[in-house]
């Protein structure tokens, strides 16, 4: 099969996605998946704004995937109540707290929020997409956009621009990984997996600091998540103010 000419494909359906692939041989190039959409879609999770990232044949930023429905239904979980306060969103793998997206004021995403792809970048120097995430956060934020871009086929850059509404907002940045994390400094985490390394670097804001959170389930009915963690940082945004969260994922070439 002949590889496609374009290194990026974008779909603008109810659950819009942008997919980047720069190589077609095993272990070669980069793979990026960027997801918009809505939790109100059939079988959806609260994962709008999420991304996955693969480099050097290693999946660095991952999605834990769904939990098998029967394992929840046999425990009496009201899985098909998809209202804002429905029990579906208490399932560990289904809400936004354990996806590679933003969380504001510790709250779940708005079920009826819908994240469109605003723009797609198709040049080799910048491959990626931007998303409007505003509707996920209700009255907590006035504006929120995310840009996920593969820069010069060297590293992935994730840029979030947020503006608080009429009250302060606490914004959490999250990335799920099955790599082994090592904190090099407050702004840099080194991930190691399958003999390869990746640096995750906070470029902005300067006061932000990484921490590592175990993916220990919240309830007895939740599936275990062995070998995976979340790397997170929190940013406090004053009422009405704007803030930029900028993170680089840089493969270490040795």
Predicted regions span which residues?
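CBM-like, beta-strand-rich accessory domains located in the C-terminal region of large
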Residues: 71-254
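Carbohydrate-active enzyme catalytic cores, enriched for enzymes
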Residues: 1-60, 122-126, 130-132, 230-232, ...
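Glycine-rich nucleotide phosphate-binding loop and flanking beta-alpha elements
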Residues: 26, 40, 68, 110, ...
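Active-site donor-binding loop signature of nucleotide-sugar glycosyltransferases
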Residues: 36, 64, 104
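Cytochrome P450 core scaffold surrounding the K-helix E-X-X-R motif
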Residues: 61-64, 69-73
